[in-house]
Amino acid sequence: MPHSVLTPADAERLGQPVRRFIADSIIPLEQQAFAAGLDDKLRVRLQQLANDAGLLAPQAPAEFGGGGADFVTSAVLLEEAGYSPLGPLAMNCSAPDEGNMHLLAVVATAEQKDRYLRPLVRGELRSCFAMTEPAPGAGSDPTALRTLARKVAGGWLLDGDKHFITGADGAGFAIVMARAQGPDAPEGASMFLVDAGNPGWQVGDQMRTIDAGTVGGHSRVQLREAFVGDDAVLGEPGRGFAHAQVRLVPARLTHCMRWLGAARRAHDIAVRRASGRELFGAPLGSLGMAQQLIADNEIELVACRALLWQVAAQVAQGVKGTEESSRAKVFISEATGRIVDRAVQLAGGAGVTEESVIGRIYADIRAFRIYDGPSEAHRAAIARRAVARIERA
């Protein structure tokens, strides 16, 4: 499909198999999964269903077991996956694994791809991306990175503390950001592949966050003289921040894709309730205040999708996408939050329950305005670039 063209008819055709799979195979399992909690046993079960349907990791390279979908097609598939809180997990297109797959596909050596990317795509293990640190370390400002990598004979020793590391508990390996140390060390950050069995990789407690949609939660991690060989360096030493952009730009957009699907689900549930519930002798959906909530959601869903498809096409055409993805992430994270908030209001008491699913989506989606950079950090960067363009003109 031409990257510059994606029509509603295209989206309907591309998304239909995923839509049918989510409706028939995944949504019926939601309440049981919410009650029991998400774990690797559930992940394996769900991913087997997706594999049987030919829908496992549709966005990943075909040569490593994925579906090989381009980025424009992925915008449709991942939105449909996000229609259920379990959908991205089932289809192996959830964070952080989806972003790590893309990073490995672009940056890793052939040996690293066979060792890490192939089993990750197949769902044989999970991964995590370890950059965020306790203050005053790396967070919204990644250049504040404090984790150190000291060069020794045959490899590196990693030391530092990480937190909010999504999926760390139970992950098979981590991609760790660290700053090289030593007289001949390259400036800047470097990336290292660390196996979960490394004695210096210590996963602590899971942080109790309002979202509950990730297997392995968000954990504190310590690195204490964690030795990795020279073959564990991912990409070029000293180019970790540049390599991180390879991951972060698409990851911002795939977050948008999944959460757009979740927001649409919350809206659909609320509208269905409004159409069938009577209030003060009239259908709820006929009341002016309810109609405003519904209409505003309809408008913002279309606006989110239009912006997302545009930026996905630009990235597919080779645009670096740093600013484009930043703008999309701010707008879509905030708009989907508003959409789900209106859905809660429209659904009333049912809107705050997991039984309606809206409550689950509401708790999960709030963190989207913080993940992959808070809105304020993105706005500051967008504004700086705008001023710089005027000054250069």
Ranges and model annotations:
Residues G123-E133:
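A short, Trp-centered hydrophobic/proline-enriched beta-strand micro-motif
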Residues P136-D141, W156:
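Hydrophobic, small-residue-rich alpha-helical packing segments that form membrane-like cores
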Residues A144, P199-F227:
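Flexible, small-/acidic-enriched active-site or ligand-binding loops
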